[in-house]
Amino acid sequence: MIGNLSGIVDEVRSDHIILNVNDVGYMVYLSAKTLSACAIGSRIKLLIETYANNRENTTQLYGFISEEEQQCLRLLVKVSGVSYKTAMSILSKLTPEQLFLAIMNEDKVTLKMSGLGLKLINRIITELSGKVSKLEINNNNFHPINEDALSALINLGYEKMKAYDTIKKYRPNLDTKDIIRMALKELSTL
């Protein structure tokens, strides 16, 4: 079993890289977000998840920059009907924080994407809602927020994740009116 790989990026493709580790090139599949951080010639260290694809008689490597993203993949593939490829496409669209919030809030709109039907989205929410709340999450990645400010922005028509990403920058103990005012100002410039 491979825990991590550290090497130089030789090639960047649409869904994977070739990582040169001591003159051996490993094909490592990445989420779109991780892939966008890779440049040919750059040195990178990835956490690795190994998948033995028995149907195609191959072993595939999936790479992650953060433990949270790796945890998400491990949780997602335990859900019946979620393949590694599907899990990676989810992680390409959502950060671990956004995924956890969508599951905890049963936010089907955020989870809706190509390749995920309503039944599978419901199964993901049902099977993972209890597990997500018990996860050990790096406190640097999850921020307490002013729920009233979030609710106000959503009621004004802003997308839930965009509103959350905006107001998490402000201290939750600020006055709700001030948070809403600052968030509206920021959202109007986007």
From Swiss-Prot:
Signal peptide: none annotated. GO terms for biological process: DNA recombination; DNA repair. Keywords: Cytoplasm, DNA damage, DNA recombination, DNA repair, DNA-binding. One of its GO terms (cellular component) is Holliday junction helicase complex. InterPro entries: DNA_helicase_Holl-junc_RuvA_I (IPR013849), NA-bd_OB-fold (IPR012340), RuvA (IPR000085), RuvA_2-like (IPR010994), RuvA_C (IPR011114), RuvA_C_sf (IPR036267). The keyword Cytoplasm applies. Disulfide bonds: none annotated. Residues 144-147 are annotated as: Flexible linker. Residues 147-190 are annotated as: Domain III. Residues 66-143 are annotated as: Domain II. It is found in: Cytoplasm. Residues 1-65 are annotated as: Domain I. GO terms for molecular function: ATP binding; four-way junction DNA binding; four-way junction helicase activity. It comes from the Bacteria. Belongs to the RuvA family. Has three domains with a flexible linker between the domains II and III and assumes an 'L' shape. Domain III is highly mobile and contacts RuvB. Homotetramer. Forms an RuvA(8)-RuvB(12)-Holliday junction (HJ) complex. HJ DNA is sandwiched between 2 RuvA tetramers; dsDNA enters through RuvA and exits via RuvB. An RuvB hexamer assembles on each DNA strand where it exits the tetramer. Each RuvB hexamer is contacted by two RuvA subunits (via domain III) on 2 adjacent RuvB subunits; this complex drives branch migration. In the full resolvosome a probable DNA-RuvA(4)-RuvB(12)-RuvC(2) complex forms which resolves the HJ. The RuvA-RuvB-RuvC complex processes Holliday junction (HJ) DNA during genetic recombination and DNA repair, while the RuvA-RuvB complex plays an important role in the rescue of blocked DNA replication forks via replication fork reversal (RFR). RuvA specifically binds to HJ cruciform DNA, conferring on it an open structure. The RuvB hexamer acts as an ATP-dependent pump, pulling dsDNA into and through the RuvAB complex. HJ branch migration allows RuvC to scan DNA until it finds its consensus sequence, where it cleaves and resolves the cruciform DNA. This is Holliday junction branch migration complex subunit RuvA. It comes from Wolbachia sp. subsp. Drosophila simulans (strain wRi).
